[in-house]
A protein has these predicted regions:
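Terminal-region recognition feature
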Residues: 2-149, 155, 160-162, 166-178, ...
Length: 230
């Protein structure tokens, strides 16, 4: 309905309170050429009703997907919405990302993932776990066929950290966090001693290729990088 569309667009434009962060939609708007983005799957939401999920509003199932242009070249983009259940991976969330890969492989165009994700959506249990596997499988299928770019803006936790490493090129904002397990999971460690989730550590470990000072610089570097792709 018109009301649902309005709520989805408004929610996708929300920012996390007290944080100087762009919203999921604002990141896409800054990345692609003006007025070039076509959203796909805007009305899709979560299917699960377990653990009171039926009471939660999850517009777009926590991810904005579609395609647009960067300097006239087609790119497929997904941007996770941290204002919607933390941008966590659920069944339909994963299906939307996989659909981007299918469309991108058919078109021979890059996939750009703008990551801001709390990890697995626990309420969806094995359906969410299967979503991770589906995303990994699509990335492996796309490897060598199309460029895959990941950009870590906020949190990239749990299984999605594997997805960023499977990409061909990974960008990371200086204040972002990338981890499978918390740094505190290491015996005797704490973040002040060695923040294994931080950009400095991840760049030294060659997990990420480019570290940027802020979101604006990160987006500008992706745009510049895409201009070099054939």
């Amino acid at each position: 309905s018109e009301k649902n569309c309005y709520n989805i667009i408004i929610h996708g434009g929300l920012i996390m309170s007290n944080e100087a962060k762009l919203s999921a939609r604002e990141r896409i708007e800054a990345l692609v050429d003006a007025n070039s983005f076509d959203e796909i799957g805007a009305l899709i939401t979560k299917r699960s009703t377990d653990f009171n999920m039926q009471e939660k509003s999850v517009p777009g199932d926590g991810v904005v997907t579609g395609y647009g242009l960067i300097d006239g070249s087609v790119v497929y983009v997904y941007s996770q919405d941290a204002a919607s259940v933390g941008g966590s991976i659920g069944e339909m969330h994963a299906k939307k990302i996989c659909n981007m890969y299918d469309m991108a492989m058919k078109a021979g165009a890059p996939v750009i993932g703008l990551i801001d994700c709390a990890g697995l959506r626990l309420q969806e249990a094995t359906d969410a776990l299967n979503g991770f596997g589906s995303i990994y499988a699509k990335q492996v299928e796309a490897s060598g066929l199309i460029p895959q770019i990941s950009a870590v803006f906020g949190t990239c936790g749990g299984g999605l950290a594997v997805s960023s490493v499977l990409s061909d090129f990974t960008f990371m904002e200086k204040g972002a966090k990338l981890f499978v397990n918390s740094p505190n999971a290491l015996c005797g460690n704490y973040t002040d001693k060695c923040d294994t989730s931080g950009a400095d550590f991840q760049s030294t470990a060659n997990t990420v290729d480019f570290v940027c000072e802020g979101e604006a610089e990160l987006i500008a570097q992706i745009r510049d990088f895409v201009s070099y792709l054939p």
